[in-house]
């Protein structure tokens, strides 16, 4: 629909319904690129239907399902299942992402071509970083052959250790293990080099520090 202050010459038609939107936000439907659900495998926690209802309530009209499920979405049949199930039960558009590596273990590349053919719109190991640069290069190069999008979580796992938030005074006050900005910046730097090398389509799942922005 058209919107704007000068949409009508006389400000508003005589028969127009006026909806007071003061204090509200008018925007296109939001898209969430990183949603974790319980279905398949943990429907007691959350289903595609309940996730879709929550999304709709918050103004999200489309979301991408991460492959962190039980079993992991690293098989064409599971991609098809998620797509069909979401279409039948969810109130919003749901797009399945396939696992970039088998079992999200970061050691063996998934069948990207078959997963994309089944309906996967992107490939990711979700909140896990592929530690091996060789495996990451192979994944990006193979994905490039299919014009497939790779979504990455960039964080050097060895340097991040058991940290749970960015390193700093707030983490110290909360008694939480900190993650140095270098852990993210180093991983982003590696991925940027590999993207340049392979020509793959790449989406950085999250950026949480200025050091990573400097690399980008």
PLM feature segments, named:
Residues 1-29:
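Histidine-rich, glycine-flanked metal-binding segment
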Residues 6, 36, 67-71, 99-100, ...:
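Short, ordered loop/turn segments at secondary-structure junctions
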Residues 12, 88-90, 198:
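Short, structurally constrained coil/turn elements
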Residues 21, 33-40, 126, 154:
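Generic detector of well-ordered alpha-helical packing
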Residues 24-25, 41-94, 102-121, 137, ...:
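Alpha-helical scaffold segments that flank or form the walls of functional sites
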Residues 29-35, 63-65, 94-98, 122-124, ...:
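Hydrophobic faces of well-ordered beta-strands that scaffold small-molecule active sites
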Residues 31-38, 171-177:
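Glycine/charged-rich beta-loop-alpha catalytic/anionic-binding loops adjacent to active sites
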Residues 107-216:
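Histidine/acidic residue-rich metal-binding segments in metalloenzymes
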